[in-house]
Structures are given as C-alpha cells and as structure tokens.
Amino acid sequence: MHTKMLKGASMGAKRKIEIRKVSRLGIWITLFLALAFVFLIIQGENEFFAMNESTEQYIQGEKAAQQLEKGADYLTEQVRMYVMTGDTSYMDAYFVEANQVKSRENALDTFKIYFDRTASFSALKAALDTSLELMTTEYCAMRLVCEANDVLPSSWPDEIKAAELSKEDEELSDDEKIKKAQHLVTEESYQEMKDIIAEEVTNCEAKLIRQTRHYQEKAMTIFSSMYSKLQIGIVLMV
C-alpha cells in the first residue's frame, strides 16, 4: 500500500510539472501573439496615415496644377486687354504677375515637393515651358502697342525693351501695329499653344489620379492583409 501511495504521489508530481510546462508555453504563446498584435496595429496605423498623406498630397498637387493654369490664363487675359484698350495698367498687372507673384513657377515648385521625378511632374513642367515660350509673342504684341501709343520707352519693362520686332513690323503705321498686336494674341497659332498648356495640365491631373490611386490601392491591400492576420491571431488566442 505504501508503494501505491508513492506511485500516486509521483504521478501527481509529473502531472503538475506537465501542467506548469503547458502553462508556461501558453504564456509564451500569448506574449508572442500580443507582441505580434502590437506590431500589426502600429504597422496598420502607419499605412493608414500614409494613405491619408497620399490623399493630402493629391489635393495639394491638384491645387498646384490648377494654379499654374490660372496663372497662364491670367497673363493671356492681361496682354489681350492691353492690346485691345491700350491701358498700361493691364501691362503693369501682367508684369506684376510674371515677375513678382509668379503663380506658375510657385505652383510647379509646390508640385515638385510631392511629385518630383514623376510623369505628372513632367507634364506640368511641359505646361509651364509652353507658357514661358508664349511670352515671347506676348512681349512683341505689347511692344507694338507701346510704340503705336507713344508710350515713353523709359517706362517700358525690360522685357518689352528687349523684344525685337521685324523690319516689316517697325515700318507699320500706328493703327497697323495695334491690329498686328491684337492678331498675335488671338490668332490660331497662339490659341494652339494655349490649348497645349491646358492639355498638359489635364494630362498632369490624369497621371496624378492614377499615381495616387495606385498608392492607395497598395496601402489598402497591405492594410487588409494585416487585418486578416489580426483576426487569425484572435482566433488562435481564443
């Protein structure tokens, strides 16, 4: 009987040891899963914030693209008003925008912060380059009107002073110079370049949408994957 009691005590001790081992293993598994949960939650928050950031960047990029186009349109409006009316306040407003406000250049700089070396940036830069190229025609148009209206050369902006007219244009009468100036900023070739600016801005916006959507879809895929892992972990703990 004494031997049976010893065997029973021995078996009870072994069971306690096994229970302790199982308990310790359970604790380690629980700790591991808890750490995994924390990691996944942090990573999930990072992806969520990254997705929000990409949305904010898209908004800023969209605003910049629109600002550039509005800046180019404003210059066109001012030069057209000047050659139509001869009111130098429009020419002054043109050069305040071009040399001081610089809406177009600032817009591209803002866009570059978020989207440098991307297809959307290249498209927006092409729009600015076309707008800058168009200014050569606008300078000539304003020079013609300045000469026709006997505006004092000393008051001309440097860009107008530097604008070169052809010999034929120099020999035009005052009325002919005004008509030529009006033609320069309304003719088909001028409008075609304006259309190119609009097309490049639209192209930029389309690429921006695709780029942002791709990034958001990628973030959502990662986020969904982590959510699934969390669900599996919860099931394992239960």
Residue ranges of each PLM-predicted region?
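Positive-inside N-terminal membrane-insertion signal
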Residues: 1-31, 224-227
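Juxtamembrane segments at transmembrane-helix boundaries
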Residues: 6-15, 81, 140-144, 238
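Juxtamembrane amphipathic/coiled-coil helical coupling segments that flank
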Residues: 12-16, 42-55, 145-148, 156, ...
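Seven-transmembrane-like multi-pass membrane architecture, highlighting hydrophobic TM helices
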Residues: 20-26, 39, 81, 196, ...
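Amphipathic alpha-helical segments and their boundaries
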Residues: 23-74, 114-130, 222, 226
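N-terminal alpha-helical signal peptides/signal-anchor transmembrane segments
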Residues: 57-83, 101-105, 124-127, 131-134, ...
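Heptad-repeat alpha-helical coiled-coil/4-helix-bundle sensor or tether segments in soluble regions
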Residues: 88-184, 188
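Selective detector of the "anchor" transmembrane alpha-helix that sits immediately C-terminal
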Residues: 228-238
